[in-house]
């Protein structure tokens, strides 16, 4: 059952990743290759995804859905978005909370600057409100049948993790080795990506001038 759970979750993640690459007009062969790489990287070494993996998968999928919702302008993606964010938060609060606020910021930014074509901002807002209301109702029903007190849920999922995070933050020791040396390969990849993006911007500016 655990392996089946891992396979299904990773399979859904891989399919949506492939769909995302195609959405950005990457050719099918490259999309398939990169999707295989993502699927191999995403599959946990233990074979069974822990709460961290579930929260990360659901958080990334919610970002995918936001991209699809903005590009395709279909309400089904806006309906599913709150559910994925909820699944991510219930799996583990971090990184779900960071992704949640990032998604909220992007939605507000999209509302301000988007051109209302197929779907109006009002319809999107009502859709998100309706979907979020369903989630809250389902959670309350689940709490009622399971005999879970709402305050206990708040303590376990919000107050307790916040106290742990606060203690860890206060005990952090910032130094050059921990920030730079221990993560040198990650920083190297970031530098290469920045150089590649700057190079692309320069090429685009030259192309536009022509």
Regions found by a protein language model. Name each.
Residues 6, 45-56:
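Short acidic/glycine- and proline-prone juxtamembrane loop motifs at membrane-interface regions
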Residues 8-40, 76:
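Transmembrane-helix signature of polytopic, membrane-embedded enzymes
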Residues 10-14, 52-64, 98-102, 106, ...:
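Hydrophobic core segments of transmembrane alpha-helices in multi-pass, intramembrane catalytic enzymes
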Residues 22-28, 62-79, 88, 112-116, ...:
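Membrane-interface transmembrane helices that cradle and orient dolichyl/undecaprenyl
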Residues 39, 43, 77-95, 99-104:
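Membrane-interface alpha helices of multi-pass inner-membrane proteins
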Residues 98-134, 200-208:
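Perimembrane helix-loop-helix junctions
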Residues 125-169, 182-185:
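Membrane-lumen/periplasm interface segments of specific transmembrane helices
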Residues 135-136, 174-210:
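Alpha-helical transmembrane segments at the extracellular/periplasmic loop-to-helix junctions
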């Amino acid at each position: 059952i655990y392996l089946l759970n891992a396979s299904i979750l990773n399979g859904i993640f891989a399919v949506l990743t492939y769909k995302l690459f195609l959405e950005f007009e990457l050719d099918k062969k490259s999309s398939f290759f990169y999707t295989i790489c993502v699927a191999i990287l995403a599959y946990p070494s233990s074979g069974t995804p822990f709460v961290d993996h579930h929260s990360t998968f659901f958080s990334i999928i919610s970002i995918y859905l936001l991209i699809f919702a903005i590009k395709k302008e279909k309400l089904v993606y806006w309906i599913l978005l709150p559910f994925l964010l909820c699944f991510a938060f219930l799996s583990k609060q971090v990184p779900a909370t960071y992704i949640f606020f990032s998604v909220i910021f992007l939605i507000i930014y999209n509302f301000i600057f988007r051109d209302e074509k197929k779907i109006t901002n009002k319809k999107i807002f009502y859709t998100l409100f309706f979907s979020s209301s369903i989630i809250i109702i389902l959670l309350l029903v689940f709490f009622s049948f399971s005999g879970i007190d709402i305050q206990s849920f708040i303590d376990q999922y919000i107050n307790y993790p916040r106290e742990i995070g606060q203690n860890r933050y206060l005990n952090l020791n910032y130094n050059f080795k921990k920030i730079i040396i221990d993560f040198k390969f990650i920083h190297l990849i970031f530098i290469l990506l920045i150089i590649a993006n700057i190079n692309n911007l320069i090429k685009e500016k030259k192309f536009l001038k022509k």
